[in-house]
Structure formats: structure tokens, C-alpha cells
């Protein structure tokens, strides 16, 4: 039996766990949202101030085509281990990915029904959007700006950056801009050959480091909370204060509704 679907976790296909595994279906649910509202000063009704997307779930259903009870249990355990990765891809979204946790791992509830459908439920909390599998990279040499089209259908997406000091003098301050957001660093020290790197982990925790030292506290009060680029349009990425010998690379993956 061939499957129409395929799911990948950390680029490993589910069907590769065992030849007996058949991917039966993949379902995406409506995202969990919460609306922040304010009461109108007179009369009934509320004004929607903000709609916050909180989570996005994908359910992968599969069958284990073997009547051997022990083998079924062993294969299911291997699928559980497969599901512990952090990046989910599906074959009908070949150019996108989702950062997830396995919220509900599969389990064999019947030893007799060898055609029973099992399911693994994945949930994206930190970034509840599908995002580009291949990032867009924009390079700015020295101080200046560069425009680039950022893919996606969501409002905005996170931007990461790396400032490489290719000169012979220390870079003591730098400002990075993406759209209408900016990170301004002061009283830092990027040595010759060193780099300032800003980025986000799987839990969307921001970091900014020079070598192994955090410089997150060196952002000025004018800095934005996050570096963000609008999706579905051309965006200006800019650098100032880095000097003529700096090379800055901005990295962004467009988000999709």
C-alpha cells in the first residue's frame, strides 16, 4: 500500500521508521487565538485591539501494517522517538516547515486490530506559523542598506543577524534595522575577526552574543523587543555604526497564515 502523504521530523520521513508504517492522513486544525478587546465608553459592544495567535496543531495519522503484536509495539515506540524532534515538514507544503513539540505521542490501544489508525499530534507554540524552509539572506557591506522581498502571508516574521568585523579596529556600537524595528547596541566590543550574532532558539528566546558572551543587556532603550520584517513585501535592512569593514547578514524565514 502506497501513501499519498509523508511527514518529516528533523528531515526524517515517518515511513522510513519501518516498511510497515503507512501514513494515512495529515490534518491541520484552526489555530488557537485570543482577542484582546476594550469596551466602548458608551453603548454596547467591544473594540478588538489585538488578535493573538497562540498555537497551531497538526495531526499525523498512520497505520502499522503487521499482525505481529510485539513488532507493532516496537514500531510504535520507534515512531514515538521519531516524533521527539523539533521541526515538522509535510509533503504537500514542500517549501515550508513548522517548529513543534509532540503534544500527544502515538500509542497502540488495541493489540487485535492491526489496521487501527494511530496518531501523533504536533503543536507549534513559540512560532504558531508555517515558515519558509529556506531562509532569505540579505548582506550589507559596511554601513548602508539593502532591500529584499520577504515571502509569507502573515503580518511579520523574526529576523536574525550577524555582524562580522573584517577590519583591524574594534567595533564599539552598531544599529541593525529591519523594516520599522531596530536593535541598537552600545558599549560593546566586536574584535577584529569577531562577530556579533543575534538570534532565537526553538522557544523563541532572543540571544545576542559576541563570542560566548551575551551582550543582550547592551541594547539601548530605543531598541525594539524583536527584530521583525513585514511579510509579503520588500523590506529595507540597514546597518549603521559598524564601519566600512563590517559585513552584516540578515536572515529571515517568511511566516504563513
Description of each model-found segment:
Residues 1-37:
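Polar/acidic, low-complexity leader/linker segments enriched in S/T/G and N/D
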Residues 1-5, 81-86, 168-171, 202:
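A short, compositionally biased
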Residues 11, 92-94, 180, 212:
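Residue-level detection of beta-strand-connecting loop/turn positions
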Residues 15-26, 101-106, 219-221:
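A structural signal for short, hydrophobic beta-strand segments that form beta-sheets
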Residues 28, 85-129:
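Short beta-strand and beta-hairpin "edge-sheet" elements
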Residues 38-70, 114-128, 233-235:
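Oligomerization/assembly interface segments of phage tail-like spikes and tubes
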Residues 63-105, 236:
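Short, acidic/charged, Gly/Pro-enriched secondary-structure junctions
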Residues 130-257:
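Intrinsically disordered, low-complexity segments enriched in serine, threonine, and glycine
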Amino acid at each position: 500500500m502506497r501513501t499519498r502523504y509523508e511527514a518529516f521530523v528533523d528531515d526524517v520521513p515517518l515511513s522510513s521508521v519501518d516498511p510497515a508504517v503507512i501514513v494515512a492522513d495529515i490534518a491541520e486544525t484552526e489555530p488557537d487565538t485570543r482577542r484582546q478587546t476594550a469596551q466602548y465608553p458608551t453603548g454596547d459592544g467591544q473594540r478588538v485591539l489585538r488578535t493573538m495567535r497562540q498555537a497551531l496543531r497538526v495531526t499525523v495519522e498512520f497505520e502499522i501494517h503487521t499482525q505481529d503484536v510485539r513488532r507493532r509495539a516496537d514500531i510504535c515506540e520507534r515512531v514515538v522517538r521519531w516524533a521527539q524532534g523539533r521541526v515538522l515538514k509535510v509533503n504537500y507544503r514542500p517549501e515550508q516547515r513548522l517548529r513543534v513539540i509532540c503534544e500527544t505521542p502515538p500509542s497502540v490501544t488495541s493489540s487485535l486490530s492491526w489496521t487501527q489508525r494511530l496518531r501523533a499530534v504536533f503543536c507549534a507554540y513559540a512560532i504558531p506559523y508555517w515558515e519558509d524552509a529556506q531562509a532569505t539572506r540579505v548582506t550589507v557591506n559596511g554601513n548602508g542598506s539593502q532591500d529584499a522581498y520577504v515571502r509569507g502571508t502573515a503580518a511579520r516574521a523574526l529576523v536574525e543577524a550577524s555582524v562580522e568585523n573584517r577590519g583591524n579596529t574594534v567595533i564599539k556600537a552598531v544599529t541593525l534595522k529591519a523594516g520599522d524595528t531596530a536593535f541598537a547596541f552600545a558599549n560593546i566590543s566586536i574584535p577584529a575577526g569577531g562577530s556579533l550574532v543575534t538570534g532565537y532558539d526553538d522557544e523563541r528566546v532572543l540571544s545576542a552574543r559576541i563570542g560566548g558572551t551575551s551582550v543582550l543587556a547592551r541594547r539601548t532603550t530605543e531598541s525594539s523587543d524583536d527584530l521583525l520584517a513585514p511579510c509579503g513585501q520588500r523590506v529595507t535592512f540597514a546597518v549603521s555604526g559598524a564601519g566600512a569593514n563590517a559585513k552584516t547578514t540578515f536572515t529571515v524565514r517568511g511566516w504563513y497564515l
